[in-house]
Amino acid sequence: MAVGMENATASGECGEILKPRTDKREYRRIVLKNSLEVLLISDPETDKCAASMNVSVGSFTDPEGLEGLAHFLEHMLFYASEKYPEEDSYSKYITEHGGSTNAYTSSEDTNYHFDINTDSFYEALDRFAQFFIQPLMSTDATMREIKAVDSEHQNNLLSDSWRMAQLQKHLSREDHPYHKFSTGNMDTLHVRPEENGVDTRSELIKFYDEHYSANIMHLVVYGKENLDKTQGLVEALFQGIRNTNQGIPRFPGQPCTLDHLQVLVKAVPIMQGHELSVSWPVTPSISHYEEAPCRYLGDLIGHEGEGSLFHALKILGWATGLYAGEADWSMEYSFFNVSIDLTDAGHEHMQDILGLLFEYIKVLQQSGVSQWIFDELSAICEAEFHYQAKIDPISYAVDISSNMKIYPTKHWLVGSSLPSKFNPAIVQKVLDELSPNNVRIFWESNKFEGQTDKVEPWYNTAYSLEKITKFTIQEWMQSAPDVNLLLPTPNVFIPTDFSLKDLKDKDIFPVLLRKTSYSRLWYKPDTKFFKPKAYVKMDFNCPLAVSSPDAAVLSDIFVWLLVDYLNEYAYYAQAAGLDYGLSLSDNGFELSLAGFNHKLRILLEAVIQKIAKFEVKPDRFSVIKETVTKAYQNNKFQQPHEQATNYCSLVLQDQIWPWTEELDALSHLEAEDLANFVPMLLSRTFVECYIAGNVEKDEAESMVKHIEDVLFTDSKPICRPLFPSQFLTNRVTELGTGMKHFYYQEGSNSSDENSALVHYIQVHKDEFSMNSKLQLFELIAKQDTFHQLRTIEQLGYITSLSLSNDSGVYGVQFIIQSSVKGPGHIDSRVESLLKDLESKFYNMSDEEFKSNVTNLIDMKLEKDKNLDEESWFYWAEIQTGTLKFNRIDAEVAALRLLKKDEWIDFFDEYIKVDAPNKKSLSICVYGNQHLKEMRNDKDKIPSTSIEIEDIVCFRKSQPLYGSLKL
């Protein structure tokens, strides 16, 4: 069952680097004179270059009283350097040359990374290197970026994941850095330091000087050139980083003592729902990464097949999700965590659930560590490693740079993802640590509101704490239901045939292989990636699916129940590298399958059979209805920018319903309603299919023929063809030309201080030349938007400009979320930005214009890196009905012909302030501290503008763009 390892190494200065045997890239490890360790990657096929620098210092090293300083430094290094002193010029250069840039700060690391078009790599790499050689951290920029860090923190305040993570840290040893608040805010970076006579900027520079040393940095450079040329480049640019011979900071000891164990913590979340999180401090797996003890145990405790813990909880109606594995690990400590999403009934049976969890751990203890289970895990991981899809260079570089300080050179690429050494004693040691003596239990529920007596200081999470003993847990185990908990059975979905089909057809675009009154099949053989994988999409077009709020909700529950019924079976396929999903689509529901092609058809047939034999089980209906209800209710707690985006979609999209109406409909629906609805839903159906990858023509046709045989041509068919008039498509509201439209709404979460604006400009219906002009505007204006509105004006951490494509109608969206300014003010600043851009465009030189066009062409010609990326593009063309599979070439051709004057005319006509053919929509969502501004903002609306008071009425009054799907 194991996959061979031949041709799976690459040369390195420190021995061989294990690499996937299908990987043609070259690798080389070097160490510069300043002790900077570097991995060079040469990929002649790439059209993006990338780099990632991992610095082995993070928030654990923050000085006392300056919480968040490491994170703040990460922000500051982006600003400027002595060699490139213009503020934000690094980000501007990267963006204008088709790239992206980002960074993150973790407990013990800070990682900086970027990607860019290949012909701009040298200068980008030079600018990047200056972060670590001579950065400028000006006084003015310091205060502005403290505000940005604070804005980031404000966005996290109402996030349950951030709140619970900090609560777990809060309830740990105060003398361990795990206990710290890590992200920083205005209080920790400005107010308190100032009160204590501490200059934050001086401390920032001191922190940089003390900790940013070349010998604790690890660099990955991913280039197109050969290794020798890339090595010369790296030696020239990065040799200037100082080496102060710092040791990598170490933080020995577990964050939890006996005082922090055997505790039950009840906490009040923001969102509706109940969650149980059970955590044990354990021996870090990183020291035994080839034996993978936590991966082994996580796969068993988190298994979802029959006989598993989750299956038992699901049958009892107590849980809707269970996740197990290692979390919050370092070289010195680690936690093993089991998280269970509870139903309302499960919340009432928390003790029984914990009893069953410890009963399952007891089953594992009694069964011993199994060789065959480890061998299955190893076989799956080996197949996934050796046949992994290529990912974007920036993600690849980040993954490897973070691995370099942890693993020996040989395992830099694979990390801990390839268990290969069966050692029962090591697994047993961690299993023994999953004991009642060693446990921390965190129980979240809104039902605890008003029942807590403590508050976590950074996120104001209400909680209570009580001690429990091992005897308490033993009582829970004894009183738990008597269910048959078992180890999983062997996984029949593990692929064993990795051969590539002899695909005689070399079509570069999808071809229409088959069409009947029941279905249409688009087929695209793999001519690029040569992996034993396939990609399948099937859109079941059912006109009834979204015909009303009731129908939309019933369709949603139908899809949820299908997934629920298939879960025990399909879980094995997903564990073996065969992803599958069912979801609602614009006019029905969609099936997705992707992964190893060997046993894909087996899963496909199981899904189709479940659709054909669908029946409503009242007990499962009740559980799913409860889950869906909470999901709708939690829309209230979306971030303001998400609310604004949803309102924008409601204005524009012809066939979507407000979530409030769907929630109201849901409350009245019962199992009988769904039982009556599903046969009607499926009674008229058309299946749009796309099959790509390592699949032969006759195989693809056979799959679709099987669907037709089961659903359409059986002696008692479930589905019949659509009537010609039933081929519905989603159409888009056409905004009034030369008109500004405004929609004002109070934020749905009264506790959220943030406000948000979506400033949408609708431009045109899909057309190559117009698309290219709009894309060029977005490329040039994107960085100016970020620099002006976020960096200079500090309106909000979430600030973006992006293209929008609503069913083939193109436009641009400015999205800003702010705790400091209201939407009316932000909207005026967007218009001011557009005036600044107008001046910039008019004064742009021909050379600069040509450079921007060239950069956009390079971006558009970037090759798909894997089968999934290629398939997403083609499937979008099929779904929207445009079928312009040659879109990239056509839009590039339009760009090559584009003149500067022609492009400026486009801007003048459709985008600039008061453009004659401009169609704009401002969605204003007001947080609680800006509510008083809403009335005044409404009063300021010009008489030539339109305030949308009722979205549905407005939508009915407007014309619709014609559908592209004919």
Curated annotation (Swiss-Prot):
SUPFAM superfamilies: LuxS/MPP-like metallohydrolase (SSF63411)
GO function terms (MF aspect): metal ion binding; metalloendopeptidase activity
Record keywords: Hydrolase, Metal-binding, Metalloprotease, Protease, Zinc
Record-listed E.C. numbers: 3.4.24.-
BP-aspect Gene Ontology terms: proteolysis
Active-site residue numbers: 74 (proton acceptor), 145
Enzyme class, spelled out: hydrolase
Binding, Zn(2+): 71, 75, 152
Pfam families assigned: Peptidase_M16, Peptidase_M16_C, Peptidase_M16_M, PqqF-like_C_4
Cofactor(s) for this UniProt protein: Zn(2+)
CC terms in the record's Gene Ontology section: cytoplasm
Record note on cofactor: Binds 1 zinc ion per subunit.
Source domain of life: Eukaryota
Family recorded in the similarity comment: Belongs to the peptidase M16 family.
Protein name: Insulin-degrading enzyme-like 2
